[in-house]
């Protein structure tokens, strides 16, 4: 491999902005902030959403009622299943 063309791979602490949940993973991202986590100092990357706050992983997922075209037409013009 050529020297000097690859980014530095290091362990980084990611912190969920919504919940404060932290986890360490390898990354090439750089940060000027650092944080103490589990006895070590890591660069800190703040993320808006992670597995700790995402509805899919937390089980608090909400499903929107997706009406099809026919249902919207029937609702708009007052047709119901009894007619």
Curated annotation (Swiss-Prot):
GO molecular function, one term: structural constituent of ribosome
Keyword Transferase (UniProt): no
A single GO cellular-component term on record: ribonucleoprotein complex
Pfam families, alphabetized: Ribosomal_L31 (PF01197)
GO BP term (any one): translation
Keyword Ribonucleoprotein: yes
Keywords noted in UniProt: Ribonucleoprotein, Ribosomal protein
Superkingdom per UniProt: Bacteria
TM helices/strands, residue ranges: none
Coiled-coil boundaries: none
Gene3D superfamilies named among the record's database cross-references: Ribosomal protein L31 (4.10.830.30)
Family listed: Belongs to the bacterial ribosomal protein bL31 family. Type B subfamily.
Subunit field text: Part of the 50S ribosomal subunit.
PANTHER family in the record: 50S RIBOSOMAL PROTEIN L31, CHLOROPLASTIC, LARGE RIBOSOMAL SUBUNIT PROTEIN BL31C
Role played: Binds the 23S rRNA.
The name this protein goes by in its record: Large ribosomal subunit protein bL31B
Organism: Lactobacillus delbrueckii subsp. bulgaricus (strain ATCC 11842 / DSM 20081 / BCRC 10696 / JCM 1002 / NBRC 13953 / NCIMB 11778 / NCTC 12712 / WDCM 00102 / Lb 14)
Gene: rpmE2
